[in-house]
Design a protein with these regions (language model features):
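Conserved CoA-thioester-binding segment of acyl-CoA-metabolizing enzymes
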Residues: 1-62
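Hydrophobic/aromatic residues within transmembrane alpha-helices
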Residues: 24, 61, 74, 124-125
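Glycine- (often His-adjacent) and acidic-residue-rich active-site loop
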Residues: 31, 63-101, 147
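Conserved phosphate-binding and hydrolysis motifs of nucleotide-dependent enzymes
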Residues: 33, 72, 115, 121
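Hydrophobic alpha-helical membrane-association signature
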Residues: 39-42, 91-94, 124
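Acidic-histidine catalytic/liganding microenvironments
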Residues: 53, 105-106
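CoA-thioester-processing core
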Residues: 98-104, 112, 118-160
Length: 160
């Protein structure tokens, strides 16, 4: 697992098994379920565990609280976890690893979207096989409005 052994914040990924259904919930409600480094690492690990569990037939990802699926990266931790070349590399490896786990799992994946699905949350949703959303869900890529570029590998899933 990329970034293993690093100092990470409290992890906020809820993993549940309900019969043949694997559930992964992003739970950082005070930040609209924005992803911390620890959450990215736990997301990849949860998907890897479900991939290796023969009793799981489908994986459903959702946001806790009913107001946001995921608001992307938790920018409040950028100073700590993205302030040096090494920390940026560790962060990017965690995002890429968890996204790869999600894209390549050989079980159907469903993004259950309710509320905000922006930035990295949009990326997570596009890595899933299916996306189901409420009528009031909001999709956006805010970095584009700020003139920030995306890594090419981060643009691949939405374009496929």
């Amino acid at each position: 697992m990329p970034g293993a052994g690093t100092d990470t914040p409290i992890k906020r990924i809820i993993v549940e098994k309900d019969g043949a259904i694997g559930r992964i919930k992003m739970d950082n409600q005070s930040r609209r379920n924005a992803m911390t480094l620890g959450m990215w690492q736990d997301l990849g690990k949860a998907i890897e565990d479900f991939a290796n569990d023969d009793s799981i037939r489908v994986v459903i990802l959702s946001g806790e609280g009913g107001k946001s699926f995921c608001a992307g990266a938790d920018i409040s931790e950028f100073e700590k976890n993205r302030s040096s070349e090494d920390s940026v590399r560790i962060y990017n490896e965690a995002v890429e690893w968890s996204s790869d786990q999600l894209r390549t799992i050989e079980k159907p994946t469903i993004a259950k979207i309710d509320g905000f699905c922006v930035g990295g949350g949009f990326g997570i949703a596009t890595c899933c096989d299916m996306r189901i959303c409420t009528d009031d869900s909001i999709f956006a890529i805010p970095a584009a409005k700020l003139g920030l570029g995306y890594r090419v590998d981060g643009l691949k899933p939405p374009c496929e």
